[in-house]
Amino acid sequence: MSEVRVKENESLDSALKRFKRQCAKAGVLAEVRKREHYESPSVRRKKKSEAARKRRYK
């Protein structure tokens, strides 16, 4: 979980900017999008193999 403490004499905008940067770096939004809908294990395996095939032939 990303956590940002607002420093003395720091504007809320800059603290929010730091928080957003930390979330992006941690991959929070990507994880949320990935888990938005349930994927069965067979679908996950299929996507993983297709991605590997794409990387190999690119």
UniProtKB/Swiss-Prot annotation:
UniProt keyword terms in alphabetical order: Ribonucleoprotein, Ribosomal protein
Biased composition (Basic residues): 43-58
InterPro entries attached to this UniProt entry: Ribosomal_bS21, Ribosomal_bS21_CS, Ribosomal_bS21_sf
Swiss-Prot/TrEMBL GO biological process terms: translation
Keyword Ribosomal protein listed: yes
Record carries keyword Ribonucleoprotein: yes
Region Disordered, annotated ranges: 35-58
Residue ranges crossing the lipid bilayer per the database entry: none
A GO CC term assigned to this protein in UniProt: ribonucleoprotein complex
Domain of life: Bacteria
Pfam families: Ribosomal_S21
GO molecular function: structural constituent of ribosome
NCBIfam families reported in the protein's UniProt record: S21p
Family: Belongs to the bacterial ribosomal protein bS21 family.
Entry-linked PANTHER family: MITOCHONDRIAL 28S RIBOSOMAL PROTEIN S21, SMALL RIBOSOMAL SUBUNIT PROTEIN BS21
Listed name of the protein: Small ribosomal subunit protein bS21
Gene from which this protein is expressed: rpsU
